[in-house]
């Protein structure tokens, strides 16, 4: 979400940061591009607790009180696809609330301190897929082929 959601709808803009979502909206808004975010109230995720650490299955605790995850859970604990374009002028939707950021690095111990990004949903995304309870993906165990160059060759060297 920190990559695809428009950075101008978060606190990233105060830090002078931008992302793919913002660039796509600025340069391709008339091309039918749709920014789709993701949120979950609780479940499990595959991530590492710091850069360079091994991946592991981690528990994702319920969304923080007042966060978008909590609000969507309280609205009915079923999965939802929210089309947000028509909510851009509705104060209930444009209010900035915390939205959980889970990436390849995630540490539930810092859940209340650094895993939430203040977000105006309809300004950040065109749509949001909300899964009330998510389950981590199962890793694919790829067997490398010795005589074939890596997929990123030569850039991955």
Task: Name these PLM-found stretches.
Residues 3-157:
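C-terminal regions of proteins
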